[in-house]
């Protein structure tokens, strides 16, 4: 038998029997001695084995290739060249040949991505390339790969008007960006620099220049740091695909710059119009997903927008909040979304206005402002009580006007006697009793049970949510400082089962202010401090941790949002690696001992003993939960453990004091089922017994529902994928039915699949549908009827555009629409709407955009603002503005639109040096705008607890100086990872540690932005 045949048979057997990479390397050494093979032939055999299997993704294959590279049997350049030869990237859409070839060639992009990522790791750790020839070969292979991917992109664009090129395939985007990062990594090595600096490699540099020139225009939509790194590489080594141009001449560049300045100076701004749609868009954006409410940032935006015209500001803000509620009703938004909008109107706005009034140096006629705002509302949407009986339509908002007026009266904005005048009829309720935060804190300290009652009232729409939230968060912080974990447990349990209450909390507090004390307590939990029973301690620890997990997964929070600055934090380790199982030989001696004790307690002994728990801290148990599941399930699948015994042992985890551990365990189990190549019957039976237990205690039911809320979305996606591969299975649907009610738990601002399908089937695709939305907003503002309902709008559409097609293309569409509306004499209105869309808060960039408003509270050395994982509309606009001198020469009208929009956005987003006629120091002192845990000023909510400088308010001018300095320093931001899944079935996942921070694709949540400066 020939060497290639023997190696082919060997590889086929290894894949079929799921031989791990360590054993594969040992077996390969033996076969190399018996049947030596050239590296080109070897990699061909490896990749052809994939074709024989016909599997879209096998995680073992790239691990085998990486193992052969580490053994020195394969070079990266050879691997990349062969990988391209066998890749499905060559398939062209819409051709008969491609269809015929599809039968012979399997989909390879997932494997291609992983192999290239392994090459990135080898380069970044210094293991490759080992010679100048290998380096040159690697450069050539990367250039060929880039040309192939760009060609595929253009083929997709040409094949269908609805195709989005790269953006039509997350795998293609990941592959594209991986190639760029690999190129940057190789060019940063010593041998890479030698190759690029050598005059004897002109042919290579020309080819590489062609590839870079094709790559960079597409890269700008994906990763600005990567684009900047490769752009610098191109300029440094003159990689333009041709001999370097002759001296351009400094004078011509200077002339271009001067012409750009003169062009901008020639543009005269029109009147700044504050359209009704502008604030309508901004409020929608604040509440589209996680409530993005920062009082200082909002007040700054409103002050920039309205100046000293506070009566107009208040009137328009009230109108916008009612418009948002009206839109939600007509769009049939969920009751959860409708509740948040109502709570913002009734609970947030009155307290916000009260803060403004307390600091105002001028009289603001609140009753008149409210009257004018209410007169602009559609009476059919907000009917009076008497009209309800004659109306046939939806009366869900019939009592909102009354609730808002009573809340305003409760905050002393208007006298109670004016409610009847403003309503036009007798009110049907009495004025609610107003709360004081300090009184509520005293009540909870005296009677801890009062906290439960108040948490229930957070969801009331009586205007009292602000003081309640302030009291609850202050008490929680004090309890954390005092380590009074029993009372804290009860508060955390009460909050965990009320997701809507968490939404209201974020109207008044940032996530960091709520969660930083909890995470610090969990991280510093010393097991030897408590000498009592272990079960209550597990109970308290689990309840506190569960609330942190609820916040994290409901709102997709980053480590920065959670207030975690220590890389060795237990909470951070749990989120990043908790759902990844470990091999036994990777565990420490104490971990092996704890694991054995828990396995014995669950499956051998009569139950969990005090000795088992007292020997293992809660932190250690949670970090071992996935490994415990992995080992137990493996024993059952191997026939060493009866399923009923397995099921009985897992039922112990349904006890309240251990239930929160199912968050990490179910995440691991879902990944295991999704990855399984063998029959997943046993894991599915285990999963069904855990998500739908035959019996569970009353106390545990609420915790179990919370656990399902957290894990349902990922489990649902994984199980549906498994069902697609095994359509005949009948044991998946019952699990999906149990999970279905929990799928609406996340609140991240992501759109629904049905919404995306509607937008993408628009004649102009997603960008066309966004332009159509902008047109409807302009049309609404030009209507002479002030009572006309707002047009249908959800900010999820704009967020989807940024995440899917990228901010650069989306901004281009907005600029095109702005020019069109300008030609139709609606330019000033359209400019305000476009600027509002650009300024609207976005979850990914909220941390960096809000940080300048709290410079005193931010210690960038200890707690740096994270990097933003994507290019925002503001970033894209800034890049367009930099290019105005060149754009003005080719397309003056477009350059003018860029300049006007840039100016309007800059005016709306600029930190104000002083709010006219508002004494901000008085505002802070009277309205208790204390700097909280992370410095997010929240009106009406003093930040309590350690670290707050009571009575030591910062000077406003100093704050603004610091903010300007921070802005000049160019602070970046980003978003943290979720709980890391073991996506390779317990195999070597070292590459994931490098790539967890890498944003490998727009719209692909598996990867985040790579710190380019740190890597290169």
Swiss-Prot record:
Q: Name one GO biological process term.
A: regulation of transcription by RNA polymerase II
Q: What is its main location?
A: nucleus
One term of GO molecular function: transcription coregulator activity
Give yes or no: UniProt keyword Transport: no
PANTHER family, A to Z: MEDIATOR OF RNA POLYMERASE II TRANSCRIPTION SUBUNIT 5 (PTHR35784:SF1)
* Job description of the protein: Component of the Mediator complex, a coactivator involved in the regulated transcription of nearly all RNA polymerase II-dependent genes. Mediator functions as a bridge to convey information from gene-specific regulatory proteins to the basal RNA polymerase II transcription machinery. Mediator is recruited to promoters by direct interactions with regulatory proteins and serves as a scaffold for the assembly of a functional preinitiation complex with RNA polymerase II and the general transcription factors.
Q: What is this protein called?
A: Mediator of RNA polymerase II transcription subunit 5
Q: Which organism is it from?
A: Aspergillus terreus (strain NIH 2624 / FGSC A1156)
Q: What is the lineage of its organism?
A: Eukaryota, Fungi, Dikarya, Ascomycota, Pezizomycotina
């Amino acid at each position: 038998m020939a060497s290639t045949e023997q190696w082919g048979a060997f590889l086929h057997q290894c894949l079929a029997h799921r031989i791990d990479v360590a054993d594969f390397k040992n077996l390969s050494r033996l076969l190399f001695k018996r049947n030596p093979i050239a590296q080109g032939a070897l990699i061909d055999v490896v990749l052809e084995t994939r074709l024989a299997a016909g599997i879209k993704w096998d995680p073992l294959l790239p691990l085998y290739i990486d193992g052969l590279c580490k053994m020195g049997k394969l070079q990266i350049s050879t691997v990349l060249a062969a990988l391209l030869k066998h890749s499905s990237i060559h398939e062209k859409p819409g051709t008969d040949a491609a269809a015929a070839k599809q039968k012979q060639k399997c989909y390879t992009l997932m494997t291609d991505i992983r192999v290239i990522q392994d090459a990135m790791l080898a380069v970044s750790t210094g293991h490759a390339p080992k010679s100048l020839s290998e380096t040159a070969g690697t450069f050539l292979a990367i250039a060929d790969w880039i040309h192939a991917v760009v060609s595929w992109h253009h083929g997709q664009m040409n094949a269908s008007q609805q195709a989005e090129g790269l953006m039509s395939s997350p795998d293609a985007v990941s592959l594209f960006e991986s190639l760029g990062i690999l190129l940057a990594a190789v060019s940063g090595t010593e041998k890479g620099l030698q190759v690029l600096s050598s005059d004897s490699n002109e042919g290579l540099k020309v080819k590489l220049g062609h590839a870079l020139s094709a790559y960079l225009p597409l890269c700008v939509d994906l990763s600005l740091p990567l684009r900047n790194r490769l752009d610098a590489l191109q300029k440094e080594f003159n990689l333009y695909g041709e001999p370097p141009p002759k001296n351009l001449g400094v004078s011509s560049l200077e002339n271009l710059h001067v012409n750009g300045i003169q062009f901008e100076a020639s543009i005269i701004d029109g009147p700044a119009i504050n359209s009704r749609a502008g604030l309508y868009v901004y409020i929608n954006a604040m509440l589209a997903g996680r409530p993005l409410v920062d009082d200082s940032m909002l007040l700054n935006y409103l002050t920039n927008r309205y100046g000293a015209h506070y009566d107009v500001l208040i009137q328009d803000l009230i109108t916008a909040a009612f418009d948002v509620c009206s839109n939600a009703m007509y769009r049939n938004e969920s009751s959860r979304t409708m509740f948040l909008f109502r709570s913002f109107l009734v609970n947030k706005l009155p307290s916000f206005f009260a803060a403004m009034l307390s600091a105002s140096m001028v009289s603001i006629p609140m009753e008149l402002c409210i009257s004018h705002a209410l007169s602009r509302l559609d009476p059919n949407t907000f009917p009076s009580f008497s009209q309800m009986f004659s109306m046939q339509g939806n009366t869900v908002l019939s009592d909102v006007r009354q609730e808002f007026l009573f809340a305003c009266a409760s905050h002393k904005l208007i006298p109670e006697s004016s409610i009847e005048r403003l309503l036009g009829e007798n009110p049907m309720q009495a004025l609610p009793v107003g709360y004081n935060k300090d009184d509520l804190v005293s009540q909870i300290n005296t009677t801890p049970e009062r906290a439960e009652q108040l948490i229930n009232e957070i969801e009331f729409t009586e205007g009292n949510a602000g003081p309640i939230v302030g009291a609850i968060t202050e008490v929680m912080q004090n309890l954390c400082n005092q380590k009074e974990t029993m009372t804290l447990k009860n508060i955390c349990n009460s909050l965990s089962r009320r997701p809507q209450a968490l939404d209201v909390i974020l109207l008044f507090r940032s996530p960091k202010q709520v969660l930083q004390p909890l995470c610090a307590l969990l991280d510093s939990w010393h097991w030897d401090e408590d000498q009592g029973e272990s079960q209550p301690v597990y109970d308290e620890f689990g309840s506190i941790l569960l609330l942190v997990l609820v916040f994290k997964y409901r709102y997709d929070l980053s480590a920065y949002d959670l207030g975690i600055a220590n890389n060795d934090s237990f909470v951070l380790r749990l989120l990043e690696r908790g759902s990844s199982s470990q091999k036994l030989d990777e565990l420490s001696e104490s971990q092996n001992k704890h694991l054995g004790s828990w396995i014995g307690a669950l499956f051998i002994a009569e139950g969990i003993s005090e000795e088992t728990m007292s020997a293992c801290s809660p932190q250690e148990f949670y970090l071992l939960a996935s490994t415990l599941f992995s080992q137990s399930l493996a024993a059952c699948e191997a026939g060493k453990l009866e399923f009923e015994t397995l099921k009985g042992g897992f039922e112990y985890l349904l006890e309240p004091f251990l239930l929160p551990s199912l968050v990490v365990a179910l995440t691991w189990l879902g990944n295991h089922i999704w990855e399984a190549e063998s029959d997943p019957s046993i894991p599915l039976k285990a999963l069904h017994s855990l998500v739908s237990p035959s019996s569970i205690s009353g106390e545990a039911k609420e915790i179990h529902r919370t656990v399902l809320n957290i894990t349902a979305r990922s489990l649902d996606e994984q199980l549906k994928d498994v069902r697609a591969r095994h359509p005949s299975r009948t044991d998946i649907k019952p699990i999906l039915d149990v999970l279905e009610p929990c799928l609406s738990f996340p609140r991240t601002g992501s759109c629904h699949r049905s919404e995306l399908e509607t937008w993408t089937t628009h004649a102009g695709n997603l960008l066309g549908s966004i332009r159509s939305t902008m047109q409807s907003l302009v049309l609404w503002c030009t209507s002479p009827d002030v009572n006309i309902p707002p047009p249908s709008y959800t900010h999820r559409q704009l967020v989807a555009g940024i995440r899917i097609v990228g901010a650069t293309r989306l901004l281009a569409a907005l600029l095109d629409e702005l020019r069109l509306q300008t030609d139709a004499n609606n330019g000033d209105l359209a400019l305000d709407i476009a600027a509002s869309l650009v300024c609207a808060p976005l979850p990914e960039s909220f941390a960096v955009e809000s940080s300048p408003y709290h410079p005193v509270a931010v210690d960038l050395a200890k707690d740096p603002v994270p990097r933003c994982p994507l290019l925002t509309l503001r970033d894209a606009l800034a890049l367009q503005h930099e290019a105005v001198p060149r754009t003005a020469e080719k397309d003056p009208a477009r350059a003018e639109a860029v300049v006007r929009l840039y100016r309007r956005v800059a005016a709306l987003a600029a930190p104000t040096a002083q709010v006219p006629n508002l004494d901000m120091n008085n505002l802070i002192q009277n309205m208790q705008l204390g700097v909280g845990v992370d410095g997010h000023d929240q009106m009406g909510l003093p930040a309590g607890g350690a670290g707050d400088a009571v009575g030591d308010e910062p000077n406003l001018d100093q704050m603004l100086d610091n903010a300007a300095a921070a802005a000049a320093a160019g602070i970046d931001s980003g978003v943290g990872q979720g709980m890391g899944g073991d996506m390779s079935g317990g195999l070597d996942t070292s590459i994931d540690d490098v790539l967890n921070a890498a944003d490998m694709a727009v719209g692909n949540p598996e990867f985040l932005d790579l710190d380019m400066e740190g890597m290169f």
